[in-house]
């Protein structure tokens, strides 16, 4: 397979390494990655790679589909909450997979994967992806109800169909899959990253600037764009372009609740909270997805933000200006929030823990520098 528009990210590098450890050949030329799976000879992902990347659990459905067995350890990733994988395992069991959990390892085996009816108690993106990957080569039909509706699910379904799968209903709450005997290689262009796009909109908005984003899908960003409009920014939306002009002083957001798509994404909550720290008035953030996604609050407070957290709610009272400080990113999106806040702060801000930011942002300092930011990496 050849994947285009594949960013340089720490998580992508780790994914490439997982594939190579499994026996696949991976070649990158710029933003094009080619994967040859014909030499795949292993069905186990080593613990050190699983520990570093939460999304590594998505390999489970694909490996069991191909090899009829798989061994992985419990995944790691950013420390933003419990994020149990029971939904993933329940979905695979519905397809006839026997799963044993022993000493931190997940051992899966089956004689054959058989289509079934999978109901997700929560519309988990990862569990939906795992179910899709396992079911595309199952015998018979599979129906996934209460499926995640995120644009990334649509993108995965389109990619699988390019390889010969028969998946329909992506983007809705019911996905139907007719199993095929095997998939074939394909060339596919990965969708633009809507969270990265929204982060750059936040970076421009907090400085009262103007920005033009190209190669984006505005239709996938509705909830985020509505919040920006409520804060007083001006937006001009074109097919694959967003042009934003921000006021000198942003308005408060009032109440933002993170929800599964098409609601407001949990992944952009932190950068938008950075916006609220210097907005006029009080904003309230209610985090409904992860129970530990306010780790950036203490660091923003070090910069002079006025934020009070109680349970899953954070009340942000806008201040006139933030002050530069030494802060530390403790997870990916919280790190992005610190970068956004630092752009508008008086003085110099030094951000540690940049390895978290590199998990989800390609050369963030390069693109911000091109937009006029004073930023460098040491």
Give the location of each predicted region.
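Short, structured segments at the rim of ligand-binding sites
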Residues: 1-378
């Amino acid at each position: 397979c050849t994947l285009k528009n594949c960013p340089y990210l720490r998580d992508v590098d780790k994914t490439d390494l997982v594939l190579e450890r499994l026996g696949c050949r991976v070649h990158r030329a710029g933003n094009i990655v080619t994967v040859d799976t014909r030499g795949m000879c292993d069905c186990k992902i080593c613990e050190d790679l699983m520990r570093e990347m939460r999304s590594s659990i998505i390999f489970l459905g694909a490996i069991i589909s191909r090899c009829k067995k798989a061994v992985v350890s419990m995944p790691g990733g950013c420390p933003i909450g419990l994020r149990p994988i029971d939904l993933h395992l329940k979905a695979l069991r519905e397809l006839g997979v026997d799963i044993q959990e022993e000493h931190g390892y997940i051992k899966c085996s089956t004689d054959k994967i058989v289509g079934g009816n999978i109901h997700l108690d929560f519309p988990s993106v990862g569990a939906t992806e795992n179910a899709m990957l396992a079911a595309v080569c199952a015998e018979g039909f599979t129906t996934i109800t209460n499926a995640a509706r995120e644009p990334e699910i649509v993108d995965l379904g389109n990619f699988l169909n390019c390889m010969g799968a028969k998946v329909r209903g992506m983007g809705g709450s019911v996905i139907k899959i007719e199993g095929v005997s095997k998939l074939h290689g394909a060339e596919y262009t990965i969708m633009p990253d809507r969270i990265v796009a929204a982060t750059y909109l936040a970076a421009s908005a907090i400085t009262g600037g103007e920005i033009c984003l190209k190669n984006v899908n505005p239709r996938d960003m509705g909830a985020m764009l509505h919040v920006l409009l409520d804060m007083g920014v001006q937006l001009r939306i074109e097919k694959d372009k967003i042009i934003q002009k921000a006021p000198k002083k942003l308005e408060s957001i009032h109440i933002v609740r993170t929800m599964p798509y098409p609601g407001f994404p949990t992944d952009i909550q932190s950068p938008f909270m950075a916006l609220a720290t210097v907005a006029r008035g009080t904003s309230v953030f209610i985090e409904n997805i992860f129970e530990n996604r306010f780790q950036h609050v203490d660091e923003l407070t070090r910069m002079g933000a006025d934020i009070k957290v109680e349970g899953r709610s954070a009340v942000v009272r806008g201040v006139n200006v933030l002050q530069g400080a030494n802060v530390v990113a403790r997870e990916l999106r919280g790190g992005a929030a610190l970068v956004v806040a630092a752009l508008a702060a008086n003085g110099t801000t030094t951000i540690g823990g940049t390895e978290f930011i590199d998990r989800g942002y390609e050369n963030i300092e390069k693109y911000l520098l091109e937009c006029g930011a004073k930023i460098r990496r040491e």
